[in-house]
Amino acid sequence: MGFIILTKDLIPDKPHQSLCGKCDICIEHCPTKAIVEPFVIQSDLCIAYHTIESRDKTIPKKIEKKLGGWVAGCDICQDVCPWNKSVPYNNNHETKPKEWIKNLNVESLDWDDKTWQENLKGSTLKRIKPWMWKRNIQANIKNKKIKI
C-alpha cells in the first residue's frame, strides 16, 4: 500500500463502467472457483495468489490439483473474457516471454539462486523467489503439467 501526501485536493476519476452485463464466463471457467461473484475474488482459492504472492512452503492440495500447469500466476479469467478478444496483440519485445520461461522443466529445479536471479533480471516475475519457482514447478510436476 502506498501513500501520497498533498496539500491540494484532487478530483477523483469516475469509476470504470462495467461492461460485463450478465456475462459470467470468467466465473464459469475459473478452475478453483476463486471468483465467487462478479468482481469478487477469494484469494485463498486463486492460483495467481498461490503461485506469486503466497510465501507458504507448499501449495494446498486442493489448489495444487487445479494448477493446470500454471507456474507464475493464472490468466484463465483474462483469456476467456470476451472483451479481451478485441485487444490488439502487443508485439513489443519487452513484453514477450523469455525463452527460458517457455522451457521450465525438472532441470530448472537444479538451478541455483544466482541463475534464477540472472534469468529474472528486469522482470516483474522476480517477485517470485527462487524457492517459490521450485515449489510451483514441483507442484505441477506432480500433476504432470507445466505452463507459464
Where are these regions (language model features)?
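Immediate flanking context of iron-sulfur cluster ligation sites
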Residues: 11-21, 63-74
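Short Fe-S-cluster ligation motifs
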Residues: 50, 54-72, 104-126
